[in-house]
């Protein structure tokens, strides 16, 4: 530690001297949740609890403190105390402008400044008295300190919250390594500048640590065969955490981020902790399966502004529901048996912690559960159970003293004890001044008899003097713990200039003392209480008991989520429909479709269901059309992050790491008959990230929407997006450079592949293994034809360039995307077996597409290229059926061949045509029921089925819309009737707030966030 502990001011150390032995007696002691000791006693000696219970032995040297009427609890433990100050770090921090990894690294630090697992949070720690005072005022006596920035942020520490001194440190090497999904922005050249990149860097760093450990083991055993590995203090520290099974504490901003952390923890066998976010109630089952300890904030949303109907338009149903459910998050987690501790973190005003906690208790969160979440639970997981968390013999004397039940709104926290030292916070007056008093007072020869009426709160009384000539409001009223009572009045009503001050002592119903006029004349006074305070309604507002939300969580949460997850019937029979098989049978009129256990069983006439079937659905589709589910070969929906634009080659990043299964676009696209989508990385990179093929299973978590068994793919890009000026001077800046970047990457991948093979064969484990590189792993998969390339492309010269590169390196191009000059070189595309996924009739949206024509698709199809139409848009994906109709218009093509452009053809391009794309026996039961011909702009999608499960139904949608409308009105009325303070949010100045799982739409057309 670098001298971080400031010396204690000698003037503040008097309470460090005698006495060191205390006897606290007469209190109601709550030694742990669920236990109460009435009129109990605690002996504290040298900072430790010597005894606790009823009628304990009284040490002769103890200083006795009478706590009659008080409650004593274990001191609270803050599990997530953020250390903000990092200026004195001895390594570069933040983003480094246009510097390569080797240029920013020191000899032993990690190349990326956001990776600092070797950092100890106390290296640059400065504890501000205001910070500790704020926490002590809430009853906290201990804190788990965590670093605030970076990706691998460093090791935590445990401290006491008393006066800062070397003895305040409980454990300098705390129990957790803190991790955050931190990244820059598009204007920032440093890696990573996206969530995609942050996750990839986390994974690569863990693999680096594994390799580093293995490399040193081999080197130490066989130094004669190997060069000494470069020392890396970051990886050394990370390996220590891994070997000690320390916790890895991931900070999460929403509930799906918790599941993302769970995938990383599963991959690397981590002891997972989560810093929560308040949205956990949305995915409780999945979060429970993580078996993680969660540090939970009480950051309830402010009351939405719905005061006018115009303002209410800016508030989504998701926001309204979150406002109603969020205060029950802790209760619902407790009911699921998920272990958690509560934190003041994320609160702008720390004082609101207790208010929010009591609000949760008021709504149904158990008092014992609430108390456990700030005492025994954090103590258990932070490794402090032997010394803190309960009031027991031998434990550190960290405790909290209140003037009543902590969970009573009127109760005040009077003091905390930290290591056996008392920190007075505020005192509750022993006497109660409220009531009506007859007061006699005299100065000089004048004697007066008036009435004094004291009302208000016990600790904050107010009142008035009722004299014969006037009723005079008291200017101030005070009452202290030693029964000293004081008040003042303006003297002008009594023909006295200035303020007249009174003070005295209350004993039961009698009070007496003296006053002082502005002229220093002494006033003698005495008073007798003749009536208690009646708690007039004007003085004391009756509090309405708040009830827990009655809303049922939807999947996903929001307006169109499902209250019950969809189930798959055993048998589905669609009768009397016009069926577009998209297979050899073509279009069949007045036919039936039979589905069993999620698979197409038969297409034919007069099909039937056995009467013994337990679960079946029969649909009369007379006059309707049934098609395979539509497939979008180029989408950017359902992802939190699309482009890692900091480098030209980012093959290590994966869309599957950032899937957003709660994206409302999924539901909207289901309503257009879409069932499968190829979610691609953006187009800012010569070699971008790995794709994710999904099925639009609305309501399932991210893992649940992945298309099982779909071939792996990756996004490439050519042209303006890759080399344009927006790339911040990043190489390449010309179209020639793009080719060289791609060739250079594959040359490195070939060398990497060869090294992997030679090292595995060489010298029987006596050579240091090749470091696993996630970027090169993906490129090797391409070389091995295990990963398809999907390439953003427009111009014929660039398309031909990539064709030649693919031939040189022997990899497979799955599709050229956009490919608007593909009609010029269709034969070359067909020759290598690549597909073309294009737009129907888009052109002139930038100069690069100046030669685009609407006949492009049909012309390539005629040349033997497998062609599909895609959306590259969350909106256009809702009507790909009418995009297919344009193929018939510009073809000319048959209706069936045109519809192939959005069904079987994209399935072929993605390598999933054995499962989807046509209605044939054995394939997945992904189908759509249309009101009419699917190529007609007048036809409507009525039902969308995936794997024999209904995910969209037009009739159900109408019912949901009505229910949502009614629910919205009810929530708005609840907000308007709420006693909660009005929000200061100005809807019209800032626009509508987005929920945690809402993301902006991306399109490859310009490569920008639209």
Predicted segments with their positions:
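Histidine-rich, glycine-flanked metal-binding segment
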Residues: 6-9, 14-20, 29, 33-75, ...
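Polyanionic/metal-chelating signatures
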Residues: 127-281, 412, 418, 505, ...
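C-terminal cap of metal-dependent C-N hydrolases
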Residues: 27, 396-429, 577, 921-964
């Amino acid at each position: 530690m670098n001298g971080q502990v400031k010396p204690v001011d000698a003037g503040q150390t008097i309470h460090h001297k005698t006495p060191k032995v205390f006897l606290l007696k007469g209190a109601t002691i709550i030694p742990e949740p669920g236990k109460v000791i009435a009129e109990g006693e605690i002996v504290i000696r040298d900072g430790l609890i010597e005894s606790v219970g009823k009628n304990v032995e009284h040490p002769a040297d103890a200083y006795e403190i009478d706590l009659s009427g008080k409650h004593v609890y274990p001191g609270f433990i803050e599990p997530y105390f953020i250390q903000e100050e990092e200026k004195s770090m001895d390594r570069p921090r933040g983003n480094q402008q246009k510097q390569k990894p080797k240029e920013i690294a020191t000899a032993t630090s990690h190349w990326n400044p956001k990776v600092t697992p070797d950092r100890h949070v106390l290296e640059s720690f400065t504890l501000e008295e205001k910070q500790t005072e704020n926490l002590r005022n809430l009853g906290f006596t201990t804190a788990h300190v965590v670093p605030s920035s970076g990706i691998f942020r460093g090791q935590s520490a445990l401290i006491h919250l008393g006066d800062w001194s070397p003895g305040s440190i409980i454990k300098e090497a705390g129990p957790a390594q803190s991790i955050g999904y931190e990244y820059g922005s598009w204007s920032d050249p440093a890696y990573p500048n996206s969530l995609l990149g942050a996750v990839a860097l986390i994974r690569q760093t863990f693999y680096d640590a594994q390799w580093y450990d293995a490399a040193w083991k081999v080197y130490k055993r066989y130094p004669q065969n190997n060069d000494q590995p470069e020392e890396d203090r970051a990886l050394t520290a990370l390996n220590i955490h891994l070997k000690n099974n320390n916790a890895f504490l991931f900070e999460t901003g929403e509930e799906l981020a918790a599941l993302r952390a769970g995938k990383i923890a599963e991959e690397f066998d981590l002891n997972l902790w989560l810093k929560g976010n308040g949205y956990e109630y949305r995915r409780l089952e999945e979060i429970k399966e993580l078996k993680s300890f969660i540090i939970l904030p009480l950051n309830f949303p402010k009351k939405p502004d719905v005061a006018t109907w115009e303002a209410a338009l800016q508030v989504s149903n998701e926001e309204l529901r979150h406002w109603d459910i969020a205060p029950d998050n802790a209760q619902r987690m407790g009911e699921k048996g998920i272990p958690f501790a509560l934190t003041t973190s994320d609160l702008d005003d720390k004082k609101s912690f207790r208010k929010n906690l009591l609000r949760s208790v008021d709504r149904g969160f158990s008092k014992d559960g609430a108390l456990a979440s700030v005492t025994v639970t954090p103590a258990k997981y932070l490794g402090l159970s032997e010394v803190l968390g309960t009031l027991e013999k031998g434990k550190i004397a960290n405790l909290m003293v209140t003037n009543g039940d902590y969970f009573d709104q009127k109760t005040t926290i009077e003091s905390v004890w930290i290591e056996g030292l008392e920190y007075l916070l505020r005192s509750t007056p022993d006497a109660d001044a409220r009531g009506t008093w007859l007061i006699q007072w005299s100065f000089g020869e004048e004697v007066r008899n008036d009435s004094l009426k004291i009302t208000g709160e016990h600790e904050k009384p107010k009142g008035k003097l009722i004299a014969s000539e006037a009723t005079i409001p008291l200017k101030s009223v005070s009452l202290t713990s030693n029964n000293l009572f004081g008040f003042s009045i303006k003297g002008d009503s009594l023909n006295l200039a200035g303020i007249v001050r009174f003070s005295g002592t209350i004993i039961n119903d009698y009070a007496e003392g003296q006053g002082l006029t502005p002229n220093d004349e002494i006033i003698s006074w005495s008073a007798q209480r003749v009536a208690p305070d009646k708690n007039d309604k004007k003085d004391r507002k009756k509090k309405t008991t708040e009830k827990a939300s009655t809303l049922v969580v939807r999947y996903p949460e929001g307006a169109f989520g499902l209250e019950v997850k969809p189930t798959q019937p055993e048998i589905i029979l669609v009768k009397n429909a016009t069926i577009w098989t998209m297979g050899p049978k073509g279009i069949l009129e007045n036919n039936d479709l039979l589905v069993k256990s999620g698979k197409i069983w038969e297409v034919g006439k007069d099909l039937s269901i056995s009467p013994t079937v337990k679960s079946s659905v029969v649909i009369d589709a007379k006059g309707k059309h049934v098609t395979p589910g539509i497939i979008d070969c180029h989408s950017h929906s359902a992802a939190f992050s699309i482009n890692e634009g900091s480098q030209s080659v980012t093959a290590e990043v994966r869309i599957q790491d950032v899937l957003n299964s709660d994206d409302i676009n999924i539901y909207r696209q289901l309503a257009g008959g879409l069932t499968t989508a190829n979610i691609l990385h953006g187009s800012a990179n010569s070699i971008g990230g790995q794709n994710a093929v999904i099925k639009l299973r609305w309501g399932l978590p991210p893992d649940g929407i992945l298309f099982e068994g779909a071939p792996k793919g990756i996004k490439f890009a050519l042209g303006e997006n890759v080399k344009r000026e927006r790339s911040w001077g990043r190489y390449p800046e010309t179209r020639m450079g793009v080719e060289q970047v791609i060739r250079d990457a594959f040359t490195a991948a070939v060398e990497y592949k060869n090294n992997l093979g030679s090292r595995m064969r060489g010298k029987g484990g006596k050579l240091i293994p090749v470091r696993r590189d996630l970027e090169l792993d993906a490129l090797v998969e391409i070389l091995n034809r295990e990963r398809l390339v999907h390439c953003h492309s427009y111009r014929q010269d660039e398309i031909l360039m990539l064709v030649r590169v693919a031939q040189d390196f022997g990899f497979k191009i799955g599709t050229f995307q956009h490919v608007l000059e593909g009609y010029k070189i269709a034969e070359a595309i067909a020759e290598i077996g690549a597909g073309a996924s294009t737009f129907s009739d888009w052109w002139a949206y930038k100069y690069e597409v100046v030669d685009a024509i609407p006949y492009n698709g049909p012309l390539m199809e005629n040349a033997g290229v497998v062609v599909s139409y895609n959306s590259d848009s969350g909106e256009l994906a809702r009507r790909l059926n009418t995009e297919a109709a344009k193929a018939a218009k510009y073809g000319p093509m048959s209706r069936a061949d045109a519809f192939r452009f959005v069904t079987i053809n994209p399935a072929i391009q993605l390598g999933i045509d054995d499962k989807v794309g046509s209605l044939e026996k054995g394939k997945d039961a992904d189908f759509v029921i249309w009101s009419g011909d699917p190529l007609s702009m007048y036809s409507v999608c009525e039902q969308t089925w995936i794997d024999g499960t209904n995910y969209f139904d037009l009739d159900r949608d109408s019912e949901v819309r009505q229910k949502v409308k009614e629910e919205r009105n009810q929530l708005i009325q609840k907000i308007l009737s709420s006693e909660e303070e009005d929000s200061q949010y100005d809807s019209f100045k800032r626009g509508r707030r987005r929920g945690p799982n809402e993301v902006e739409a991306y399109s490859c057309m310009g490569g920008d966030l639209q």
